[in-house]
Regions:
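A short beta-loop-alpha structural element at the N-terminal edge
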Residues: 1-15
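Conserved acetyl-CoA-binding loop-helix of GNAT-fold acetyltransferases
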Residues: 99-113, 134-138
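Conserved beta-strand-loop-alpha-helix junction that forms the acyl-donor binding cleft
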Residues: 123-133
Length: 167
């Protein structure tokens, strides 16, 4: 089941972050580093009730952050949709031990948007994060633009891609 995360989930979440970083390294993807995402990011997400986990028999196999906080660099993009009130997907990871975890979490985000009458979902990823790009395309997201960003955690030497989906 997918549910809101709580503080008891933090250890599992940080372990999933480590696993995700290892997978990213296999793709020469340096999107996540020692500072991002940090435990403090997830504590804030839990407090804001925006972090969801995929929990199967009390084991956490993935997480996703769904909120309405758009990165400031989104303002530099000419979006073909109205971004007001859009959901934004941040920090998504699924365990190698649960095939399809990221897909289930992404479908949950779309279902949550429908449930709350949200008509647009925005997200972004690093140019080297091919698995995320494939997931976005699988769900019918459209790539809008790519932006070079010069501040942490986005200063990675390659652009970030911005995506949207009308719901």
């Amino acid at each position: 089941m997918i549910r809101l995360a709580n503080k008891d989930d933090l250890l599992s979440i940080t372990q999933l972050v480590k696993e995700a970083k290892q997978i990213m390294e296999e793709f020469n993807n340096n999107q996540w580093d020692d500072e991002y995402p940090a435990k403090e990011h997830f504590e804030e997400d839990i407090e804001n009730k925006t972090l969801y986990v995929l929990d199967v028999d009390h084991t956490i196999y993935g997480f996703i952050v769904i909120d309405q906080n758009q990165s400031e660099w989104y303002d530099d993009i000419d979006w073909p949709v109205n971004r007001n009130g859009a959901y934004v997907i941040h920090r998504l990871a699924g365990s190698k031990q649960y095939k399809g975890a990221a897909t289930e979490l992404f479908q949950f985000a779309i279902d949550l948007a429908n449930e709350h009458d949200i008509h647009v979902i925005l997200t972004d990823t690093f140019a080297l994060n091919k698995p995320a790009q494939g997931l976005f395309e699988k769900f019918g997201f459209t790539k809008v633009d790519e932006i070079e960003i010069d501040y942490h955690p986005f200063d990675r030497g390659a652009p970030f891609y911005a995506y949207y989906k009308n719901i």
